[in-house]
Amino acid sequence: MDLVMLIKAAILGLVEGITEFLPISSTGHLIIAGSLLDFLDEQKRDVFVIVIQLGAILAVCWEYRRRLTDVVAGLGSDPQSWKFVTNLLIAFLPAVVLGLTFGKAIKAHLFSPVPVATAFIVGGLVILWAERRRHPIRVREVDEMTWVDALKIGLAQCFALIPGTSRSGATIIGGLFFGLSRKAATEFSFFLAIPTLTAASLYDLYKNRALLDGDMSGLMAVGFVVSFLSALVAVRGLIRYISRHDFTVFAWYRIAFGLVVLATAWSGLVSWSA
């Protein structure tokens, strides 16, 4: 197998793992990185991304395995477990409905570097604005959330259908707006990623099953493992980071990165492809 392709697979796995749970948009980074690296054709690259995304999902499941095991064990008798699962389901549904309705149109028109870069900048400005507002904390732990809180965050997640917006960014910043603590908003975003990303990945994998190629198995394995390990580091690091800091640094990163992409596109320095 081509060593260069394996290195590219590892790079994309690293990009997915690091960016999936940070408020900087994994989809946006993968679109830009995939275009820059010229990795596979567009359809095969899409299948590869689906597989490495599952690695990131597995990482958050592993990190919160005790909590998830307790929830499953408590479904027969613990009302709090049912409340937790119900809140996840309520938050999960809005993106499903809008994704199935508008997913094809969004992919056709917005899945290219320049629209993604624009979304990076807009999202960064929103985070800066959100961090400068006062947010009275009403919910300090995920278990204190009501179904209304879950629905609001689910609606916020719908903005992430626009590539470059960031699913974690939309849900975390939305949670802050709605009165959740940084810890509660971030952890609920992690938990919400499990059904949301799993459903999206399996649905896309089923639609593209004809493209599954045994020749890609090595690339997928490398990308999956790197994605899992880097996502594990990112999840643990973000929880530590937010205990002492806000999200301003991510906002400035988004703005700077978006401006660089737009500048290289407009100057002709980089010929971005879809």
Swiss-Prot record:
Keywords tagged on the record: Antibiotic resistance, Cell inner membrane, Cell membrane, Cell shape, Cell wall biogenesis/degradation, Hydrolase, Membrane, Peptidoglycan synthesis, Transmembrane, Transmembrane helix
UniProt entry tagged with the keyword Transmembrane helix: yes
GO molecular function terms listed in the Swiss-Prot or TrEMBL record: undecaprenyl-diphosphatase activity
Segments traversing the membrane: 47-64, 82-102, 110-130, 185-205, 219-239, 249-269
Keyword check for Transmembrane helix: yes
Coiled-coil segments: none
Any one GO CC term of the record: plasma membrane
Signal peptide annotation: none
UniProt membrane topology term: Multi-pass membrane protein
Catalytic activity reported: di-trans,octa-cis-undecaprenyl diphosphate + H2O = di-trans,octa-cis-undecaprenyl phosphate + phosphate + H(+)
EC number: 3.6.1.27
Subcellular location: Cell inner membrane
Primary localization: membrane
Pfam families, sorted: BacA
BP term (GO), one: cell wall organization
Function as written in the Swiss-Prot or TrEMBL entry: Catalyzes the dephosphorylation of undecaprenyl diphosphate (UPP). Confers resistance to bacitracin.
Miscellaneous comment as given in the Swiss-Prot or TrEMBL entry: Bacitracin is thought to be involved in the inhibition of peptidoglycan synthesis by sequestering undecaprenyl diphosphate, thereby reducing the pool of lipid carrier available.
Family label: Belongs to the UppP family.
UniProt protein name: Undecaprenyl-diphosphatase 2
The gene coding this protein: uppP2
